[in-house]
Swiss-Prot record:
InterPro entries: DUF520, UPF0234-like_C, UPF0234_N, YajQ-like_sf. The keyword Nucleotide-binding applies. Nucleotide-binding protein. This is Nucleotide-binding protein Noca_0564. The keyword Lyase does not apply. It comes from Nocardioides sp. (strain ATCC BAA-499 / JS614). HAMAP family: YajQ. GO terms for cellular component: cytosol. Keywords: Nucleotide-binding. The lineage of its organism: Bacteria, Bacillati, Actinomycetota, Actinomycetes, Propionibacteriales. It comes from the Bacteria. GO terms for molecular function: nucleotide binding.
Length: 163
C-alpha cells in the first residue's frame, strides 16, 4: 500500500483578508463614532496594512473592527503582527504585517513534536516553508493532525493535500 501524506502550512487567504479590509473601511465610513476622525485602513504593499486615525484610541478601535471582520471570515488572528500606535504628524498610525509561511525553527519544533509524541512510523519532512507528513496508515495521520491542533503555536496552521 502506498504512503498517505498531508502538508502542514501557514498560508493567508488574501481574498478573505481583502474582503475583511473592505468591510472594515465601509463600517468606519458609516459609524458615528468615527465621523471626523480621519480613520482609514488600506493596503501598504503585498503583505502589509496601515491604519490611520486622528487619535491612538480611534486607531485601536479600527484595529478591533478589522479583527472582528477577520474572525467572521475564518481568518486566524495569528497571521497579524500589529505594531503599537505611533504618531505621524496629526495622525496616529498602526502598521500591520501579515505573517505567512512556517519558519525553519518552527518547522523543526513541529517535526520534533511529531517524532516524540506522534504515532510510530510517521515521517515529517521540512520542504521550504511547509512540512510534509507521511505514514502508511491514514489513522496515524489523523492522530498527528489532532496532536498539532492541540498545540498553541504563535502562527496559523492549516492542513492541505491530504492523500
Amino acid at each position: 500500500m502506498a504512503d498517505s501524506s498531508f502538508d502542514i502550512v501557514s498560508k493567508i487567504d488574501r481574498q478573505e483578508v481583502d474582503n475583511a479590509l473592505g468591510q472594515t473601511a465601509r463600517e468606519i465610513a458609516t459609524r458615528f463614532d468615527f465621523k471626523g476622525t480621519g480613520a482609514s485602513i488600506e493596503w501598504q504593499g503585498e503583505h502589509a496594512i496601515e491604519i490611520s486615525a486622528s487619535a491612538d484610541d480611534r486607531a485601536s478601535a479600527v484595529l478591533d473592527v478589522f479583527k472582528t471582520k477577520l474572525v467572521k471570515r475564518d481568518v486566524s488572528l495569528k497571521v497579524l503582527d500589529a505594531s503599537e500606535p505611533r504618531q505621524s504628524g496629526q495622525q496616529s498610525k498602526i502598521a500591520i504585517a501579515l505573517k505567512e509561511g512556517i519558519s525553519s525553527e518552527d518547522a523543526k519544533k513541529i517535526s520534533k513534536l511529531i517524532r516524540d509524541e506522534g504515532p510510530k512510523g510517521v515521517k515529517a519532512q521540512i520542504q521550504g516553508d511547509e512540512l510534509r507528513v507521511s505514514s502508511k496508515k491514514r489513522d496515524d495521520l489523523q492522530a498527528v493532525i489532532a496532536l498539532v491542533k492541540q498545540q498553541d503555536y504563535d502562527f496559523a496552521v492549516q492542513f492541505t493535500n491530504y492523500r
